[in-house]
C-alpha cells in the first residue's frame, strides 16, 4: 500500500517543500515519545505538552505560508483588474483573450494552493490518529477542542479559508466580465443565472466544495441516511469499475422498497385503535399493534445487514414475500376475530424491513459522483412514504364484503399493501440486477473498486473529509516501516464483528448522539402513535381528520430540511443547531401537556408541529455529527454506524409504543401526560449530555 509519507513527498510542489507538514519528523517523534513513556523517561502530560507545541509550530508554518500565497494571488488579480479596466474602455479581442488566460493561470495556482492545504490537512489528521493509536488517548479531542475554540485559532483560519473564497469570487467575476455578451460586459452580480461557467472556475469550486465539505440541501438530506463510503475514485479505471456495478433500475427498486416500507409502517396509524376495539381490545392496544413491527425490525436489521454482505437480490425477494404475507395476516385478522393474528401480521411486516439492504446498496453499488443524490433520494423516499401512509389510510373509507372477506377502513390498508408488495415482487424479479462481487475477505465482501481504493491513497480523499475526524480503512497509515505498536495491526482496522465490539468502539460523543437519536425517535413515535386515540378522546376527530393531520406533519419534512440544509446550516455550526433544536423540542413537549381542565385543538396542533419539526431538524444535524465523530471501524461491515442508529431508533419506537399501551391501563384521560413525561425526562437528559460533550462535537 502507498503510505502517506511517500505520497506527501511525491505530490508536494518542490518550491514549496519547506512549508509542508514535516510528517516524517512528527511520526518519528510519536515513536520516540512512546518509547520514552514506556521507559518512564517522560510522563504523559509532558508528552502531550511537547507534542502540542510541535504540532502548533507546524500548523503556524502552514498558516503563514497560506496567507502569504493568498496575498500574492490577490495582488496578481488586482494588477489584472487594472488591465481589465483599460480594456473596458478600449476593447481589444486579442488582449482580452490574453487577459483571460492570465486569470486562468491565477486559477491554476489557486488549485495548487488548495492541494497544498489538502495534503497538510490529511497529514495533520493522520498524525493525530497515529498519536491516539500509539498512546490510547483521545488527543484529537483535546487538540481540536482547545485550538478550534480559541479566538486566534489557526485551525479555523486555515480550514475555514475565507481568503480562498474571496479569490474564487474575484476570479469568477473578472472572467465573467471579460465574456462578451451581445456587445456588452455583464456582471455576475447583475445576472447570476447567466454567469460564465469557465472550466477553471468549476475545477476550483469542486476543490473548495470537497475541502470545506460545504453543506447544501442535497448533502443535508444525504446525511439523514448515514450512508458511509463516500470517497471518490481516484482513477478512470476505478470510475469504470463503479459504473459497471451501477444499475439505475436496481437503485430505483431499492428506493421504492424504502418508500413502500414507510407507507406500510404508517398506513395503519389512523385506524389501529379502531381495529383493536373491533377485536375486543382496548383502544390503547394500538401501541402494541403499531410497535410490534418495530420489535421485529430490531432483529431483522441485523440479519439483513449481514445478508447484504453476500447478496442484495435475495434479501429484497425475501423482504417482499414476508411483507406480502404480513399484510395478508393483518387484513385477515378482522374476519378471524383474532388479535394474535393481527400482531403476527405486523411482526412479519417488521421481519421484512430491508432498510439495511437499501442503505448498503447505495453505499456499495452507487458511483461516488451520484451517491449523495442517491442518499438524498433514500431520505426523500422515507419522508414521502411517511406522509403518504396516513393520507392513503384517510382515503380507504369504503366498506364491503367479497364472499366471507371484509373490506373496511381497518382491513383495506393491509389488502392494499399486500397488492403493492406483490406487484413490487414481480417488478423486482424482472428488473433487479445483482452486482458482481469479489472474493470474500475477512467475513465481508469487497468489490474491485473498494479493493483498489484501499490500495491507493488519493488527493480527493482528504478533500472529501473533514480535517479532524476518523477516516476509513484507506485513510489508515500502512507505512512500510512497522514498529511494535505504531502501525496498527490488522485487527485495529477490521470492522466490528458483533454488537458488543461495536459498542466498545463508541466514544462518549457517539453515545450522546445515539441517546439524542433515541430521544427524538421516542418523542416522534409517542406523538404519531397515540394521535388517533388522543384526538378522538379530546376533539372527536374521525379517521379522515387524523389521516390529514398526520399527512400534513409528514409533508413538512422536505421543506424544513430544505430551509435548514440550504440556509441555516451554512450560518451556524452543527453543534449549535443540535443544542437549539433539542431545546425547541423540549418546549414542544412541555406545551403538549394537558395542564388545565380544557385542552384545545390549537394547543395540540401547534405543540405537535413544534415537536415534530424540531425532531426532524434534530435528526439531520444529529446524524451529520454522528458520521463525523464515529470510529472508522464503524463505517463498514455488518455492524456499521447505520445499523447502530437504526437499532437505537427502532428500540425507541418499541419503548414508546409499549409506553402507550401500559399507560392505557391508567385511563384515556391520563394517557397524554403519562406518555409525555418520559419524553420530557429523556429530552432534558440529552440536553445535559450534549452540554457536557459540546466541545468534542466537530
From Swiss-Prot:
- Keyword set includes Transmembrane: yes
Q: Which PROSITE patterns match?
A: SPX
Localization (cell) = Membrane
Keywords, ordered alphabetically: Membrane, Transmembrane, Transmembrane helix
Q: Which InterPro entries match?
A: MFS, MFS_Domain-Containing_Protein, MFS_trans_sf, SPX_dom, SPXM_SPX_plant
Q: Where are the transmembrane segments?
A: 248-268, 279-299, 316-336, 339-357, 376-396, 412-432, 514-534, 545-565, 577-597, 605-625, 671-691
Family label = Belongs to the major facilitator superfamily.
Q: What is this protein called?
A: SPX domain-containing membrane protein Os06g0129400
Amino acid at each position: 500500500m502507498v503510505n502517506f509519507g511517500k505520497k506527501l513527498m511525491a505530490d508536494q510542489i518542490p518550491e514549496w517543500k519547506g512549508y509542508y507538514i514535516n510528517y516524517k519528523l512528527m511520526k518519528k517523534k510519536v515513536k520516540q515519545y512512546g518509547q520514552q513513556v514506556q521507559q518512564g523517561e517522560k510522563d504523559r502530560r509532558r508528552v502531550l505538552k511537547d507534542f502540542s507545541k510541535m504540532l502548533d509550530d507546524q500548523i503556524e508554518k502552514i498558516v503563514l505560508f497560506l496567507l502569504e500565497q493568498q496575498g500574492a494571488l490577490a495582488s496578481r488579480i488586482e494588477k489584472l483588474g487594472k488591465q481589465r479596466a483599460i480594456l473596458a474602455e478600449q476593447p481589444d479581442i486579442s488582449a482580452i483573450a490574453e487577459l483571460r488566460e492570465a486569470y486562468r493561470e491565477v486559477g491554476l495556482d489557486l488549485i495548487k494552493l488548495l492541494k497544498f492545504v489538502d495534503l497538510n490537512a490529511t497529514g495533520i489528521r493522520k498524525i493525530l490518529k497515529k498519536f491516539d493509536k500509539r498512546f490510547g488517548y483521545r488527543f484529537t479531542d483535546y487538540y481540536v477542542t482547545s485550538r478550534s475554540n480559541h479566538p486566534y485559532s489557526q485551525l479555523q483560519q486555515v480550514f475555514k479559508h475565507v481568503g480562498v473564497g474571496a479569490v474564487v469570487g474575484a476570479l469568477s467575476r473578472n472572467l465573467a466580465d471579460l465574456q462578451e455578451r451581445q456587445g456588452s460586459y455583464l456582471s455576475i452580480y447583475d445576472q447570476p443565472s447567466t454567469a460564465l461557467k469557465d472550466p477553471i472556475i468549476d475545477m476550483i469550486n469542486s476543490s473548495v466544495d470537497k475541502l470545506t465539505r460545504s453543506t447544501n440541501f442535497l448533502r443535508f438530506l444525504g446525511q439523514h441516511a448515514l450512508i458511509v463510503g463516500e470517497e471518490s475514485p481516484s482513477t478512470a479505471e476505478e470510475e469504470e469499475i463503479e459504473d459497471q456495478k451501477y444499475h439505475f433500475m436496481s437503485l430505483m427498486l431499492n428506493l421504492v422498497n424504502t418508500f413502500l416500507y414507510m407507507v406500510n409502517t404508517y398506513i395503519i396509524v389512523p385506524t389501529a385503535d379502531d381495529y383493536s376495539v373491533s377485536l375486543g381490545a382496548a383502544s390503547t392496544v394500538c401501541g402494541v399493534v403499531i410497535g410490534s413491527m418495530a420489535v421485529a425490525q430490531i432483529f431483522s436489521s441485523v440479519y439483513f445487514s449481514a445478508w447484504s454482505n453476500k447478496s442484495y437480490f435475495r434479501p429484497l425477494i425475501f423482504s417482499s414475500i414476508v411483507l406480502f404475507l404480513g399484510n395478508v395476516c393483518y387484513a385477515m385478522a378482522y374476519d378471524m376475530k383474532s388479535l394474535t393474528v393481527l400482531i403476527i401480521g405486523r411482526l412479519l411486516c417488521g421481519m421484512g424491513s430491508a432498510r439495511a439492504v437499501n442503505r448498503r446498496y447505495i453505499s456499495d453499488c452507487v458511483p461516488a459522483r451520484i451517491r449523495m443524490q442517491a442518499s438524498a433520494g433514500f431520505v426523500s423516499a422515507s419522508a414521502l412514504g411517511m406522509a403518504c401512509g396516513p393520507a392513503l389510510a384517510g382515503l380507504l373509507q369504503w366498506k364491503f364484503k367479497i364472499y366471507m372477506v371484509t373490506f373496511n377502513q381497518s382491513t383495506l390498508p393491509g389488502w392494499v399493501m399486500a397488492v403493492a408488495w406483490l406487484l413490487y415482487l414481480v417488478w423486482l424479479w424482472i428488473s433487479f440486477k445483482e452486482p458482481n462481487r469479489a472474493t470474500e475477505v475477512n467475513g465481508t465482501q469487497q468489490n474491485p473498486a473498494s479493493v483498489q481504493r484501499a490500495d491507493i491513497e488519493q488527493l480527493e480523499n482528504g478533500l472529501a473529509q473533514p480535517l479532524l475526524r476518523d477516516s476509513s480503512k484507506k485513510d489508515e497509515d500502512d507505512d512500510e516501516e512497522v514498529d511494535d505498536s505504531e502501525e496498527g495491526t490488522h485487527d485495529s482496522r477490521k470492522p466490528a464483528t458483533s454488537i458488543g465490539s461495536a459498542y466498545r468502539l463508541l466514544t462518549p460523543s457517539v453515545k450522546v448522539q445515539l441517546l439524542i437519536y433515541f430521544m427524538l425517535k421516542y418523542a416522534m413515535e409517542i406523538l404519531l402513535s397515540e394521535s388517533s386515540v388522543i384526538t378522538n378522546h379530546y376533539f372527536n376527530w374521525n379517521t379522515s381528520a387524523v389521516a390529514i393531520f398526520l399527512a400534513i406533519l409528514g409533508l413538512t419534512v422536505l421543506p424544513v430540511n430544505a430551509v435548514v440544509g440550504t440556509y441555516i446550516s451554512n450560518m451556524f455550526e452543527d453543534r449549535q443547531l443540535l443544542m437549539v433544536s433539542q431545546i425547541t423540542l423540549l418546549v414542544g413537549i412541555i406545551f403538549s401537556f394537558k395542564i388545565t381542565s380544557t385542552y384545545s385543538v390549537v394547543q395540540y396542533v401547534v405543540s405537535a408541529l413544534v415537536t415534530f419539526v424540531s425532531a426532524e431538524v434534530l435528526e439531520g444535524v444529529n446524524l451529520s455529527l454522528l458520521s463525523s465523530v464515529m470510529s472508522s471501524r464503524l463505517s463498514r461491515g455488518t455492524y456499521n454506524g447505520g445499523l447502530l442508529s437504526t437499532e437505537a431508533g427502532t428500540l425507541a419506537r418499541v419503548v414508546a409504543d409499549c409506553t402507550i399501551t401500559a399507560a392505557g391501563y391508567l385511563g384515556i384521560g391520563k394517557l397524554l401526560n403519562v406518555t409525555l413525561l418520559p419524553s420530557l425526562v429523556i429530552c432534558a437528559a440529552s440536553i445535559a449530555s450534549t452540554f457536557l460533550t459540546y466541545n468534542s462535537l466537530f
